């Protein structure tokens, strides 16, 4: 049989999430080939900022100006009451003109195909895509791409590639949070809080602390592990495959997907630029990629994360995939904000995200990896009043870092606390 795996010199897609217009622009600037976003409905991320139709249109225009695609999620598991609103929503999307829709429900897929016949359709991981028969089924219905279930190994993905049409694309999550439930189909949130994970309102009870109680001893709660804090039995580590780009390419994956439609611009920029470097280095020269793995490891650890694992890629996860004794993030840097428009020499607008002060040494995070340490020269409020520090999140500021900056640059500072509660 002809080998249908991707030639390593082919341009691969790095697909990055965005929770807002600001984060979409960050994803584009820091290396995304495509960005996936959600509207205010039907997108499985109720707590994300998400996009109004106007913001979506602006985001699509910005991305297309930079040669980047935009995919819109509509991947809820639909009930009867959702059908007519979905039709109205798709009618609105005709004006937005995204590059593809990401869908999991067959009814929504059928509606999209009828209403948006020229739109590329991708099948969400929520559809539990675990075998090549499923891929061929969706291809027969008109899907261009299928997102593989997180439960697949590298070898299983490779076998799928060899048994589907050459023009069908495989998209795979290669970085980010992992759900303890099968491809995200979780009922814990609905049962415990009344908030439906399959409608985008998950409260993440998998991250909570649990203990056991023996039925003849009501009220006596015993930790499952010998630890006074209880145990986090459902608490998965985060997926990270930056050290395994060759294996991912060899498996025939077309699109490398980053999880995180609720993440900050700092997280998105950190992960996007690290994978951009890794992919480009490998395609340029595999030896260069191998030599730079320590750099990728360093860079990918500069975002907030929950320790790393390779998930299911190299076999079924064992006990090392879980975090049993805490529910904390590792944090190397604190996000300060994104540089806005220039207002005077060396002075720029900034919406502050975390506290910093005059005289403090901070970092300008650059898309090419050549970050710059600078000292904060001055901070002013919107009226031009000098400030020594800015303790209030989302305050509109004018800052001077003693040099010219580029709008869109991300500012960050080394974190004093290396672990923070989630």
Question: Model-derived features: where do they sit?
Answer:
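Surface-exposed amphipathic alpha-helical tracts and adjacent flexible/coil segments at the periphery
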Residues: 2-30, 34-41, 59-60, 66-76, ...
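Alpha-helix capping/helix-boundary segments
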Residues: 107-108
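Glycine-rich loop at the start of a catalytic domain that most often binds anionic cofactors/ligands
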Residues: 48-53, 81-89
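Gly/Gly-Pro- and Ser/Thr-rich, intrinsically disordered tail segments characteristic of DNA damage-repair
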Residues: 84, 118-130
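Short beta-strand elements of ligand-binding domains
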Residues: 72-73, 103, 123-125
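Glycine-rich, positively charged N-terminal anion/phosphate-binding segment
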Residues: 45-64
């Amino acid at each position: 049989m002809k080998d249908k795996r991707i030639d390593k010199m082919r341009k691969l897609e790095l697909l990055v999430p965005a929770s807002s217009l600001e984060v979409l622009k960050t994803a584009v600037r820091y290396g995304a080939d495509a960005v996936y976003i959600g509207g205010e409905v039907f997108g499985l991320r109720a707590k994300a900022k998400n996009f109004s139709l106007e913001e979506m249109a602006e985001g699509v225009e910005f991305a297309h100006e930079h040669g980047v695609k935009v995919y819109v999620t509509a991947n809820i598991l639909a009930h009867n009451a959702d059908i007519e609103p979905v039709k109205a929503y798709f009618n609105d999307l005709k004006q937005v003109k995204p590059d593809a829709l990401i869908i999991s429900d067959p009814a929504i897929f059928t509606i999209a195909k009828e209403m948006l016949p020229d739109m590329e359709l991708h099948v969400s991981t929520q559809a539990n895509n675990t075998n090549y028969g499923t891929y061929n089924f969706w291809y027969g219905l008109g899907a261009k791409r299928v997102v593989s279930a997180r439960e697949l190994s590298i070898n299983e993905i490779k076998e799928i590639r060899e048994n589907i049409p050459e023009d069908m694309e495989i998209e795979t999550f290669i970085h980010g949070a992992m759900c303890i439930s099968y491809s995200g189909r979780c009922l814990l949130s609905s049962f415990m809080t009344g908030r439906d994970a399959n409608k985008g309102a998950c409260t993440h009870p998998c991250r909570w602390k649990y203990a056991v109680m023996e039925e003849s001893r009501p009220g006596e709660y015993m930790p499952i592990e010998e630890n006074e804090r209880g145990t986090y039995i459902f608490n998965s580590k985060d997926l990270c495959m930056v050290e395994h780009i060759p294996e991912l390419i060899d498996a025939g994956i077309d699109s490398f997907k980053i999880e995180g439609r609720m993440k900050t611009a700092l997280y998105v920029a950190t992960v996007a630029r690290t994978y951009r470097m890794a992919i480009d280095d490998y395609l340029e020269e595999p030896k260069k990629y191998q030599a730079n793995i320590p750099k990728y490891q360093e860079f990918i650890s500069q975002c907030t994360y929950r320790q790393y694992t390779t998930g299911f890629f190299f076999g079924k996860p064992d006990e090392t995939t879980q975090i049993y004794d805490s529910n904390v993030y590792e944090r190397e840097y604190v996000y300060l904000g994104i540089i806005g428009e220039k207002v005077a020499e060396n002075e720029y607008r900034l919406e502050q995200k975390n506290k910093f002060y005059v005289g403090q040494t901070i970092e300008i995070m650059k898309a090419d990896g050549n970050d710059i340490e600078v000292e904060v020269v001055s901070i002013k409020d919107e009226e031009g009043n000098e400030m020594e520090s800015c303790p209030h999140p989302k305050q509109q500021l004018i800052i001077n870092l003693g040099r010219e900056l580029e709008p869109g640059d991300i500012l960050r500072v080394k974190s004093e606390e290396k672990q923070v509660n989630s």
